[in-house]
Amino acid sequence: MKKIQISPSILSADFSQLGNEIKRLEEGGADMIHVDVMDGHFVPNLTIGPPVIKALRKQCSIKFDVHLMISPVHKYIEAYADAGADIITIHPEATDNLEESISKIKSLNKKVGVSLNPETKIDLINNYLEKIDLVLIMSVNPGFGGQKFMPEVLDKVKQLKEIKSKRNMNFDIEIDGGINFDNCQSAIEAGANILVSGTTVFESNNGDIKKNINLLKLK
């Protein structure tokens, strides 16, 4: 079994102190930083773009797990790669040609993630799993932080785990949306090995990031 990793979402950080917040996450033992990029078109919210990611990249050395909720996504992939993304995750619905977009990310020497919204079926990406490094299962409808976890998506996580085992694959299974101390164990048991968490990491236990990360890892 892969080791459990925590990818805190900076959507829940203090945006007036983003540089310091990134440093706090690194010092607190975060395995990577989850950066939610929203365009107000593919999802109903606006967040940050390449210049902010480029500035933040200078503040820490751990991986940037960049989740692109933008459409059309293909023409922006290179800009986020250049800004410092290590993993670039896209939605199948946001590109005209998923295979081309996957190849584009790989050509830039970045890890490829593909995200599935709660209603999106695994069948949509089944033929691409050999080329994917990470599958991100959304456990809320994307667009805003702080939403309630949708337990029904754990069936999808279990299905992916079975596919991985049957086809002897090695992609990561990441879960994002409403992850907290009450549901992290069920997410891990279902097969997720990367947990995205924002509010829980930044706000629980008086903001003790190290403690919160360890609790999410069931330590």
Predicted regions and their residues:
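Generic enzyme active-site microenvironment
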Residues: 34, 174-175
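A structural signal for the hydrophobic beta-strands that form the central parallel beta-sheet
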Residues: 6, 175, 196-197
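Short glycine-rich anion-binding loops that position phosphate/pyrophosphate groups of nucleotides
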Residues: 140-142
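Acidic, divalent-metal-coordinating active-site segment for phosphoryl/phosphodiester hydrolysis
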Residues: 178-190
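Conserved N-terminal beta1-alpha1 strand-loop-helix module at the mouth
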Residues: 1-89, 93-97, 104-112, 124-132, ...
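Internal catalytic-core helix/loop-beta-alpha segment
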Residues: 111-115, 119
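Acidic, Mg2+-coordinating phosphoryl-transfer loop and its flanking beta/alpha structural elements
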Residues: 192-197, 201-203
